[in-house]
Amino acid sequence: MKRKKRYKHATIGKKKYYFYKIVWEDPCGDAGHADIDEMKKLKPATMISQAYIFAKDRRHVWTFSSYDSEAAVFSDRNCFPRSIIKKM
């Protein structure tokens, strides 16, 4: 029986990119008029993205979800500010 891999990754070129589930907060807005009660009800949405980590530094995380198996070409790309990421 084949053993399950501990971490899912993709090898593109000679580099491994690891797959993550990223929980992050998306700011929400409304351009209409609102009273105090409606204003306090406005909360950010908790979003979940599943993607490979391309790179990260102390301020940002770059991800991709699709890639070309023949060349280092990436699609479905995002750049997340670290301040909105709640869990990886």
Predicted features, each with a name:
Residues K2-M88:
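Conserved RNA-binding domains used in RNP assembly and mRNA/RNA metabolism
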